[in-house]
Amino acid sequence: MGDIKADTLLPTIKHLFEPIPKGPSPKATLAVEPEQRGERRFLLKREAQVPFVMLGFRVPNYSSDDSYALDILESILSHGKSSRLYQSLVYDQKNSLAVGAEYSLMQTDPSLFYFYALVNPGAKVDTVEDALYREITRLQNEPPTELELQRAKNQVEASHVFEQDSNFRHAMLLGQAESIGAGWRRVDQFLERIRAVTAKDIQRVAKQYLTADNRTVGILIPQPPKAAEPQPTAAHAGKP
């Protein structure tokens, strides 16, 4: 990337690296995570001001065509203050200070589709968790509107384009695609795949992956700060 000429650069690269003998290729050992067969839950008690709820659902990476529908699904749920989660939990129900979802298809291995919510003081953790489940069920029962779908596609497309607003960022994106095994051509195919996603695709992946048996739930329970340990007074600071 940058102001370089291939006809002058390639001979230099060959001169420097071609004499180096090729070593044996390392044997790839990839562990496959077993299928999750039921919900997992954990509570974490730490010093904090408000509770925090997180849901994680196992989903595929770039190697599955479903990854593009999941990318659009994330945008519908949590991109901006007009998103479904923000409108429902923050504006309407007022039980969360912040809420959203996260997913990245550019991963070496299958990944997670996250939901998170920062619980409003005075609201119950169970209420917020149930509200997240209702939004998931809503998507499973009703596909997004054409307006929602097109807005999400526009957001994902704009983010992808602006991510490559410099040669450095473009090179980093191509390098990431190569390093995880996706191949650099997948970067050029991304927008075409995103534009092909339909509302029925969104509903289908929500039904397939956002299920109770496929989720892990983590909840942060706030604890009061520990009392400060008393400091020695000046009279006791010296040696006896």
Where are these regions (language model features)?
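Charge-rich, well-structured scaffold segments of protease-associated domains
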Residues: 1-25, 43, 53, 92-240
